[in-house]
C-alpha cells in the first residue's frame, strides 16, 4: 500500500461501507488519513491455489486488495469487517518521504498510526448503539441480529 499511498495515508478495505465510513471519519477527527481501496472479486484470481484452499501470496498486481481478500477468506460470511493496511504509516525510518511528522510522533520508530482512529471509532460505535439501543451488527447492516443457533 505504501507504493500507491506513501507514508501519509492508510489504505482501508472491507465489506461494510458504514464501518469503513466510520473509520474514515474517525481518522479525520484524529488527523490520520485513510483512502478506501477496492475489494473487487476479480482480484481473487491472484490467491487461487492448485495445492491448497487459498494462496497467501497473490503476486504484485493489486497486492493490497488481494491481501485483504485473503483476510476475507477467514471472516465468517455476513460479518461486517474492515482492514486498515498500515504498511506505509506504521513506522518512521530514515526515508525522507515520511513528511507527516506530528508532535506526538517519535523521530524514528513505531508511530502507533491508527490506534487513535480505531479507539475513536469504537467509542463512536458504542455511543451510537447505546443511543439507538441496538447491536453493533444492526447499526452497521440495518438488519436485526440473527439469534445464535443452539447446539
Q: Which residues does each PLM region occupy?
A:
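A generic structural signal for tightly packed, nonpolar segments enriched in small/aliphatic residues
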Residues: 1-151
